[in-house]
Amino acid sequence: MTGRIAGAWAAFVLAAGSMAAAQTYTIIDIGVLKGDNESSGFAINNLGEVVGCSDTKNVQGYPCTGLVPGQHGFSWTQSGGMKDLGTLSGATVSGAIGVNDSGTVVGYSNMKGQIATNFNAVQWSSTGAITNLGTLSGGSSSAAFEINSAGEVTGDSFLSSGIVNATSWTSKKIKNLGALSKAIFTAGLAINDSGQIVGESVFGYGPPFTSHGFLWNGSTMKDLGTLTGGITSVANAINTSGVIVGQSDGSNTRGSWHAVLWNSSDKIQDLGTIPGGTYSIAFGVNDSSVVVGYGNLSNNAAHATVWTSTGGMQDLNSLIPSNSGWVLINANAVNNAGQITGYGTKGGSNHAFLLTPVN
């Protein structure tokens, strides 16, 4: 369910129903690890377990990415609270990016003696034990972004040539999934329980950077293309039915990204923006095709969004209690119960949140 880190790793339709009929949410502050003041929620499983990043470096005002020394991956449950997942032995930074329903978490960590730009894909067991998933042969760095129910993992790895290719890991082996033609950076950002993988291939060193979203179906990589007239797209998440979400530019997007959805036949749909906004991005989708992400308002402020086929694109801030004290900035993932995680500001700091639908 995630591409939200890929941008950092590599360098949201008018509401159709009345507000009375719109889905509303309760909100929980997931908090931070002891001594921290910033956190982000990156993924959520169907049991409501959230994983993400907490900032032990106190780089206040910036969303935690798990790419800065002192930042640590975490897992959180409502009953157990937040747990520091730590790093590989002697390392200084980690990010927890994906989690399956068994509580197995994937992400990345640097290694002892490595600079904080060299990472290895890692996996944490449900008990917190960390495993280095390694890199493709000759590669210096790798990252894991999602794990499915079978324990299949997707992400990326450097090759000895310096090119980055989409990668998968199973209990038996690491596999090079390749790249779209002429790409220099390719990452697998999400995987469903059928083993379908989506992500992006980036072409050239830019600027401008151009990329295309892709779908890997087990043997071949398909270019998902862009909105009409576009040059750039990213596929960030895929659900059980093969519905894919991400972002694309196009001739009608005024030079900005719009959140998009590819249906199970890979036909692309522009999901639009918050009314008055100019851009949007979709980061997560559940099996009911509820889509979450973020977009801008007319004043260019970034707000977390939710999109449904009946309600269109909505600002999540309009769907939580008005006296909550929160400004929700980004929604990264949504589970099949409709619970959403991401990050927002409360009391001047970025904190991870959990939204739960009010039935």
Model regions and ranges:
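Residue-level hotspots at or immediately adjacent to binding/recognition sites across diverse folds
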Residues: 2-359
